[in-house]
Every structure is written in C-alpha cells, then in structure tokens.
Swiss-Prot record:
The keyword Cytoplasm is assigned to this record: no
Gene that encodes the chain: deoD
Positions contributing to phosphate binding: G20, R24, R43, R87, V88, G89, S90
Reactions it catalyzes: a purine D-ribonucleoside + phosphate = a purine nucleobase + alpha-D-ribose 1-phosphate; a purine 2'-deoxy-D-ribonucleoside + phosphate = a purine nucleobase + 2-deoxy-alpha-D-ribose 1-phosphate
Stated name of the protein: Purine nucleoside phosphorylase DeoD-type
Enzyme class name: transferase
Keyword annotations from UniProtKB, A to Z: Glycosyltransferase, Transferase
Enzyme Commission number(s): 2.4.2.1
Species whose genome carries this gene: Bacillus subtilis (strain 168)
Assembly behavior: Homohexamer; trimer of homodimers.
HAMAP family (UniProt xref): Pur_nucleosid_phosp
Amino acid sequence: MSVHIGAEKGQIADTVLLPGDPLRAKFIAETYLENVECYNEVRGMYGFTGTYKGKKISVQGTGMGVPSISIYVNELIQSYDVQNLIRVGSCGAIRKDVKVRDVILAMTSSTDSQMNRVAFGSVDFAPCADFELLKNAYDAAKDKGVPVTVGSVFTADQFYNDDSQIEKLAKYGVLGVEMETTALYTLAAKHGRKALSILTVSDHVLTGEETTAEERQTTFHDMIEVALHSVSQ
C-alpha cells in the first residue's frame, strides 16, 4: 500500500489510464474492461484493474490539477512500479483550426505552475510525451477515423483564470488548455517511465462553443478507444 492508494503489490498493471474524475475511472473499467477488480477506494479516488483484449490494464482516478495528479503518479511509479501512464481527459481549445470534439495528443506541455521552477530554478524544463505511445495513439486514431491533432498544450494552475495569455499561447502553436499534463510528463521523465496525454476537446475558449453532455460521452468513447487500442498492440 501507499499513502493514497490501497492496492497490494501485483494488483496494478504496468499500464494505467488516468482520468481525473474517479467516477469516470469506474465507468471506463465497467464499460471497456473484463475481469474487473477494484483495488482502491481511498478518499473516493477509485482504481480498477481488468483486461482489454487479454492485456492487463488499470484505471486510476487522479483528481484535478498538478498537485493531485502528482500524488497519484508518484505513488503509482514508486510504490507499484507502473511503466506506462496515459492521461485521458478533456481540454479547452484555443486555436481556430482545432475543433470541439476533436482529440488532441499532447506532444509537449508548457505551464504556469511552479512545479519545474522549484526543481530546475531558472531552467525551463520542457517535458514531452513518449514517442512510441504517441505514435501508437496517432495510428489508432487514424485507423478508427477519429479526428486527431498532435501538438503542444498548456497546463494551467488555475481553472478560473483570466485569458490574457491565451492569444499569445495560440500564436506560439499551443492547441489547448488543461490542468495536469506537465506534471505527468515531468514525473515520467524524472523516473524514466513512458507517458502520454490524450485529450478530448470539450469546449472552445475563443468561440465559446461547448459540447453537450451526450456529445461529450461520444467523443469520450473515441478517446478511450484510441487509448486502449494504442496500448493493446
């Protein structure tokens, strides 16, 4: 056991999907996996292990933001030796060439969080995705006809924030805004693990367009299918 995860050694797979919402973790496990076992209920942050096409896969909720996902990623790596960590979440698009309902594969992530400044001082460490996971996910999306864009995202430290930097970020090629990817990629790099962030565009910051609850469920399905297909090869 670790401080925030109640699993025994061997209960968690080498590959873990990481939704922010613990109820979404439960939904993924019950909808897409077979032979499901719940290994964690600590603080209501559910974790499950099952199989997908015969491969052992786990799903662990992380909560929202850099501090919360950092807790779970650190413990999954250090206490359970997880090798592959894939965030499956949502983001807001900030470029007009990225559409609501698209899937973004985050190749890199910048941030206004102080996480990397604490570790590196004046050096701007640029964390990135694992290329093999990224390529597998891209190929899976293309095979399934899922609209997908690959590029940079911005990990914000606050959900309710002013948009003064959005235009500049978009000009520099940033595709969308979310709250966890930088932490995931930085910790994966620190510990020599593989990580990828797969994001559904749920709304558009510039246009105000939003998906309905039904549409979010459909595009969420596309994202999970891409994630599972990419790690089952």
